[in-house]
Amino acid sequence: MSEKRPRILIIYTGGTIGMIEDPATGTLKPFDFNHLIDNVPKIRMLDYDIEHIQFEHPIDSSDINPAHWEQIARHIGQNYEKFDGFVVLHGTDTMAFTASALSFMLENLSKPVIITGSQLPIGEVRTDGEENLITALQIAAERDPVNGEPMAVSYTHLRAHETRSNL
């Protein structure tokens, strides 16, 4: 008997990782996560059921505040029974602050919450966004979360409350 496919919820709050270049203007615009597989075809190899939620208005992470942290936590709480793991896509400026706040807001979870961002948009040919997203999805799909607390991912796995920003 085969195990069921992991169900992962991506929560896009804002940040470069969720942007794509507008070919007409060359400016960045929010990525349409309905086309995630088209832009990151490697995700097919993961064999996960992936859904997403996008903030109605993506937040520049330098403007994120406790109300946004509550919104992220609420999305996780409302979807906790439906999914096996959660990936929060976030701007890198304040990702460490959000990760730390969520580690206290979401104590004692039995499912992984992974927070990641990137320096380059997800749709670029050579980007840390693709690697960070795929790594975050793989960790979120693990059946044995790391101490049940949120983690930040950017090539290195860090416990959320141990992260810091160089701002």
Region annotations inferred by a language model:
Residues 156-163:
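Conserved small/polar residues in nucleotide/adenosyl-binding loops
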Residues 13-15, 91-92, 118-121:
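Short, ordered loop/turn segments at secondary-structure junctions
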Residues 123-154:
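Short, glycine-/small-residue-rich phosphate/pyrophosphate-handling segment
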Residues 2-78:
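N-terminal glycine-rich anion-binding loop in soluble enzyme alpha/beta folds
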Residues 82-84:
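Short acidic/histidine-rich motifs immediately flanking catalytic phosphotransfer sites
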Residues 112-128:
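Proline/glycine-rich low-complexity loops and linkers
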Residues 89-111:
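Short Gly/Thr/Asp-enriched flexible loops that form oxyanion-binding sites at enzyme active sites
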